[in-house]
Amino acid sequence: MLFHVKVVFGKNFIKVEGDEIIIGLTSKPLRGKANLELIRKLSKYFKVSRDSVRIVSGFKSRRKVVEVLLNNKFHSVGN
């Protein structure tokens, strides 16, 4: 599944609004630490391995597109 993700720094939450996931991260956006926290939180939220979550676009942006492998199949949502 593809998800549009909006990142907010300094908070710790996950909220779904329509086809967008808004996620609060406590890590600073330095050297990929925030992206790693994002992958960790989304894998826990969807109950999948970290290898099943990848950032498709927006590596250096607060708005990202993230792909999550669910049930060994990729699906597209909101596109």
Which role does the model predict for each range below?
Residues 1-41, 48-50, 54-59, 63-79:
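Contiguous, often N-terminal, cationic amphipathic patches that form binding interfaces
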